[in-house]
Curated annotation (Swiss-Prot):
Phosphoprotein is among the record's keywords: no
InterPro entries reported in the protein's UniProt record: Metallo-B-lactamas, RibonucZ/Hydroxyglut_hydro, UPF0173, UPF0173_UPF0282_UlaG_hydrolase
Protein name, UniProt field: UPF0173 metal-dependent hydrolase Dvul_0081
Pfam families linked to this entry: Lactamase_B_2
Record family assignment: Belongs to the UPF0173 family.
GO molecular function, one term: hydrolase activity
Record bears the keyword Hydrolase: yes
Record keywords, A-Z: Hydrolase
Length: 239
């Protein structure tokens, strides 16, 4: 079965397979590289927020209210989002969930991981998401590299890693390349770069570092608004 990945720029992705659509960190308004409006995207079944910063929460509340999609987040951030207008009944698991925990929604299994960053509420997190057809991806959120990535790579067969490479606030290209090795990821899409001048402006250094640290991990360079289709049966190759 095929999986379609769309990058809306920054850390904002949609992943769709098996009739299920997952949206992560839906930063549209104020995103200088977003190629579309939040109300013009494919309808998500589930929205995941990695942490409470404006460039990651984005328009999550508006999207969930407009579509009825459930919103997944860490305990603590749920209260802040409800206070901001998210109906409590749209919070996944009622109160959110926590690091190491796994919940299921629309046939999708979501495991929350730690992330090393900051957050206005709760704590920053990442997600390992297994789609209905078994395709598994890891969205790291904003994070520095951490050694426990190796454990997540042992626990889950990660078909695709979505990793920040921008530096300053997150991993830089060298750290992100080593993270691919720790995670044993089959393929990677770099994110959190090029959005603002302070961040890494291209993926050149990441490509060079990936060749050194994880040469078997396939790099997919995407531009905001672009979609690609992966076939899990073809070793993560684009179709």
């Amino acid at each position: 079965m095929q999986t379609r990945i769309t990058w809306h720029g920054h850390s904002n992705f949609q992943v769709a397979s098996g009739g299920t659509n997952v949206l992560i960190d839906p930063f549209f308004d104020g995103n200088p590289v977003a190629a579309t409006r939040w109300d013009a995207i494919d309808r998500p079944d589930l929205v995941l927020v990695t942490h409470d910063h404006g460039d990651h929460v984005g328009q999550a509340i508006d999207i969930c209210k407009a579509t009825g999609a459930k919103l997944g987040c860490v305990v603590g951030t749920d209260a802040r989002l409800v206070e901001a207008g998210l109906p409590r009944e749209l919070v996944l698991n009622g109160i959110g969930f926590n690091i190491g925990g796994t919940v299921e929604c629309a046939g999708v299994r979501i495991t929350m991981t730690q992330a090393y960053h900051s957050s206005e509420s709760g704590v920053p997190v990442g997600y390992i998401v297994t789609m209905p057809d078994g395709f598994t991806f890891y969205h790291a959120g904003d994070t520095g590299i951490f050694s426990e990535m190796e454990l997540w790579g042992r626990l889950y067969a990660i078909d695709l890693a979505l990793l920040p490479i921008g530096g300053v606030f997150t991993m830089d290209p060298r750290q992100a390349a080593l993270a691919c090795s720790l995670l044993r990821a089959r393929s990677v899409i770099p994110m959190h770069w090029g959005t603002f001048p302070v961040l890494e402006q291209n993926t050149t250094r990441f490509r060079e570092q990936l060749a050194n640290h994880a040469p078997d991990c396939r790099l997919f360079n995407m531009t905001p608004g672009e979609s690609l289709t992966l076939d899990r049966s073809q070793e993560g190759c684009a179709c």
